[in-house]
């Protein structure tokens, strides 16, 4: 990811910040925010396994704990032995919040952009979930491809009507991967679309969050997706109370992809919280 940050934005000490993207996304997704962060910050934005430019493991599905191990290894290589700042979106936010509880000594501050977790599951859902997973394995995962990068950009704008054409054109350069037949596939392993056979165990997640020692900024969007309705429920507020040093913010005029919709607002929150 390019680091064309504001040349005049040398506010505060230099620092290293890791930018962690979400599910079916790529690290370049943070470019619009990165352009607005201080020029003396070092920004490191890896692609999760099976996304973007990262390799696809020889497996038929992905296991969430592997992302924790990947993050642990990346930090050991790029920032050994020091607490780091994490800015993470959606799935990346879920990984980062768990990591901050499992390795509390490694995270100084965390900005979580809509990494809200999932609604609580019930044990009675397990039989159908395993069956759904087996059926999906049998059918095999797939993602549609496109005849041009312009078509990829159009798909991105359909998914997010707030996305500007110039933003979509930029993202399509990173999301659209040229194939031997001249078509363009999305930069994500289709196996990521397989349902997780393991239910979301909110009690386990909450216990991990209790061990977070970092300052945490929890950022939601004004126009969250329908499946985010559960964050307004008392049970979810109780869940968040497990995080001891928690601040909250809402980005007005933005949907789930807030770092595309309102990059200026998101960059301001990040800069003020981490500085």
Show where each model-derived region lies.
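Conserved alpha/beta-hydrolase catalytic His-Asp/Glu region
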Residues: 143-199, 231
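Catalytic histidine-centered segment of alpha/beta-hydrolase-like enzymes
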Residues: 251-263
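Alpha/beta-hydrolase fold catalytic core
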Residues: 1-18, 38-42, 79-82, 117, ...
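Conserved hydrolase catalytic core segment
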Residues: 82-125
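Conserved HGGG/HGGXW glycine-rich cap/lid loop of the alpha/beta-hydrolase fold
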Residues: 4-6, 10-56
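Active-site loop/oxyanion-hole signature of alpha/beta-hydrolase fold enzymes
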Residues: 44-87, 91, 251, 268
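A catalytic-pocket lid/entrance helix-loop region that shapes and gates access to the active site
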Residues: 113-146
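Conserved loop-alpha-helix segment in the C-terminal half of the alpha/beta-hydrolase fold
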Residues: 211-254
């Amino acid at each position: 990811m390019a680091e064309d940050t504001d040349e005049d934005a040398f506010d505060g000490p230099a620092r290293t910040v890791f930018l962690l993207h979400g599910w079916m996304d790529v690290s370049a997704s943070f470019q619009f925010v990165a352009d607005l962060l201080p020029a003396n910050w070092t920004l490191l934005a890896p692609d999760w396994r099976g996304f973007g430019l990262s390799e696809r493991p020889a497996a038929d599905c992905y296991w969430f704990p592997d992302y924790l191990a990947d993050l642990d290894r990346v930090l050991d290589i790029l920032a050994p032995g020091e607490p780091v700042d994490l800015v993470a979106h959606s799935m990346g936010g879920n990984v980062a919040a768990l990591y901050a509880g499992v390795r509390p000594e490694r995270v100084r501050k965390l900005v979580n952009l809509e990494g809200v977790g999932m609604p609580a599951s019930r044990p009675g859902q397990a039989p159908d979930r395993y069956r759904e997973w087996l059926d999906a394995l049998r059918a095999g995962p797939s993602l549609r491809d496109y005849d041009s990068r312009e078509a990829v950009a159009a798909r991105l704008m359909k998914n997010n009507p707030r996305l500007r054409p110039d933003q979509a054109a930029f993202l399509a350069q990173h999301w659209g991967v040229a194939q031997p037949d001249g078509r363009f596939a999305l930069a994500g392993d289709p196996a990521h679309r397989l349902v997780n056979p393991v239910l979301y165990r909110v009690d386990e997640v909450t216990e991990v969050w209790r061990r977070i020692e970092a300052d945490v900024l929890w950022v939601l969007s004004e126009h969250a997706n329908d499946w985010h309705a559960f964050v307004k429920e008392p049970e979810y507020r109780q869940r968040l109370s497990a995080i001891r040093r928690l601040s909250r913010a809402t980005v007005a005029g933005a949907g789930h992809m807030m770092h595309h919709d309102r990059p200026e607002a998101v960059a301001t929150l990040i800069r003020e919280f981490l500085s």
